[in-house]
């Protein structure tokens, strides 16, 4: 069964409604799948440029520190062995690729589950635009988002062409901005509420179902 959302304008007035397809916003939430996808996404974000030097990489240490016998001490062959200060590191990190291969269908299913969880709990909102006109206003955008939800972490999904909206909220703490084609499981789960502009919501629905939703008055 399709869910229906009221579409609100910056002044708080309801400008109509839009239906959320059940296949995208009322899908079962597979927690294990979402965990796997989020883990892979965060792993792929790691640079993996960490590097340590082994005893073979550290400069110096070619000379035997003292003779083999007669000192009463344990025999040593190099001052760059790991037990010495300034020596090499044993089993230290080396540059590597942390990315994991995740099938596209799993990524899409995890995102559907995350959005469905938010939708079932009334945490998805639809708006016409963040600010009226083409002039950015952080004050107006903050007041509008505050009227939509009292929760701190908000994901705002708007079209790439909405520069006024992006500039209005980009400095607000707890607010993260994405384009509809950037929508991902991690950011949806990290946010308490997800706010879609009608343009972005229609673009996401069209890209994943092939049938854009119309806003009804």
UniProtKB/Swiss-Prot annotation:
GO terms for cellular component: ribonucleoprotein complex; ribosome. Residues 42-100 are annotated as: Disordered. GO terms for molecular function: rRNA binding; structural constituent of ribosome. It holds the Pfam family Ribosomal_L4. InterPro entries: Ribosomal_uL4 (IPR002136), Ribosomal_uL4-like (IPR013005), Ribosomal_uL4_dom_sf (IPR023574). GO terms for biological process: translation. It comes from the Bacteria. The keyword Ribonucleoprotein applies. Keywords: Ribonucleoprotein, Ribosomal protein, RNA-binding, rRNA-binding. PANTHER family: 50S RIBOSOMAL PROTEIN L4, LARGE RIBOSOMAL SUBUNIT PROTEIN UL4M. Belongs to the universal ribosomal protein uL4 family. Part of the 50S ribosomal subunit. One of the primary rRNA binding proteins, this protein initially binds near the 5'-end of the 23S rRNA. It is important during the early stages of 50S assembly. It makes multiple contacts with different domains of the 23S rRNA in the assembled 50S subunit and ribosome. HAMAP family: Ribosomal_uL4_B (MF_01328_B). This is Large ribosomal subunit protein uL4. It comes from Mycolicibacterium paratuberculosis (strain ATCC BAA-968 / K-10) (Mycobacterium paratuberculosis). The gene is rplD.
